[in-house]
Amino acid sequence: LDYDRVNNEQREVMYKERRRVLDGDDMKESVLGMMKETVANHVYQVISDELPPEEWDLAALNAELLPIVPLNKIVLTDAEKSSGKVDDLVARLQEETVALYEQKEKEFEDFVLREIERIILLKVIDRKWMDHIDDMDQLREGIGLQAYGQRDPVVEYRMAGFEMFNDMTKAIQEETTGALFHVQVEQKIER
């Protein structure tokens, strides 16, 4: 029963988000939030404030982020070099990402892109959620098989499930971001 409670809490969160998409809510602000989160996640994953800017691995950041968000090659500004704060780089890349998406919007009629956002979000959410359910089942079986000594298996399940849920959320954000930046306009030419 406690295992089911964990699953139900996660299900409620996902179904609430899914319902927003299905109800036809304008998802643009949510999508922009996902894009900003994706940028921040990749930057913080690759670059640490503990290193001076000249040691930041921009090649790795370019390799990780640019296939998802097609920005220009990432180089540090003079201000970022002097501040040494990763947050400054994150803020600039987030601004550039939003500007790039606003440029992408001009390729579409407004209602068309809003519908594309909904379709992509729904497909990604559904696929990632189904994968997550399978992963949670495997986790439950694995925790049941392991001896946790003095640890409560339900607590371990909740903690691992929370981490997996966060990973799924990041994957939804990243895949949605990449799909929206790479969607193409096709025009039929009538003869």
Regions found by a protein language model. Give the residues of each.
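Extended, charged helical/alpha-beta scaffold domains that provide interaction surfaces
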Residues: 1-191
